[in-house]
């Protein structure tokens, strides 16, 4: 069940079935470091910390801006209401997707720290075990047509839940050791009615394949993408 913790510095929403640690501390990397619970990290726009919870493993991410504006205001956003904050919206969207049967990480906690007219945000979600992103897999070898079909089916489930993934790319598709497909990173994504926008998600995904062919020499072809994009014809 989703619970809420408040104090003078922050507001935290958390799933009490997954979080047995102190909700006031769960989004502080120092808390996990001091308790020897940091398993590793990954660096992208910022650092994602992989941590050991009592019940599961988590991925802790601090929200940061990209682009030129991000160099000026790295991690602060205008506050226009608790339910409009980045971490709360991603936390709730992940719950919506889980309820719809889409393979996404279970959200554990979302934090907002309000400072006057601005806020900072963090998200703690479950780490997908034994999984790699599609880029690293395709750098080593091609994947089967059946695995491409699985990717297409997962996108279909996401679209059936009417979720617009505004940054759908092959870094945000994970494959675990059971060849189960996962979709991650739903920051700034949202529920949208209709169908016209769905093709835009697929076009963005196609561009990411083409980019990584040039950048990293991944094993990929247009025929493989045709298998993914055929998802909309499946029942």
Swiss-Prot record:
SUPFAM superfamilies on file: Protein kinase-like (PK-like)
Gene3D superfamilies to which the protein is assigned, alphabetical: Transferase(Phosphotransferase) domain 1
Protein's GO biological process: lipopolysaccharide core region biosynthetic process
Main location: membrane
Entry keyword Heme: no
Places the protein is found: Cell inner membrane
Gene Ontology cellular-component annotations: plasma membrane
Catalysed conversion reaction: an alpha-Kdo-(2->6)-lipid IVA + ATP = a 4-O-phospho-alpha-Kdo-(2->6)-lipid IVA + ADP + H(+)
InterPro entries assigned to the protein according to its UniProt record, in alphabetical order: KDO_kinase, Kinase-like_dom_sf, Prot_kinase_dom
Membrane topology: Peripheral membrane protein
Main EC class the enzyme belongs to: transferase
Pathway noted in the entry: Bacterial outer membrane biogenesis; LPS core biosynthesis
Domain of life: Bacteria
Family statement drawn from the similarity comment of this UniProt entry: Belongs to the protein kinase superfamily. KdkA/RfaP family.
Function in brief: Catalyzes the ATP-dependent phosphorylation of the 3-deoxy-D-manno-octulosonic acid (Kdo) residue in Kdo-lipid IV(A) at the 4-OH position.
Protein name, entry field: 3-deoxy-D-manno-octulosonic acid kinase
Organism: Vibrio cholerae serotype O1 (strain ATCC 39315 / El Tor Inaba N16961)
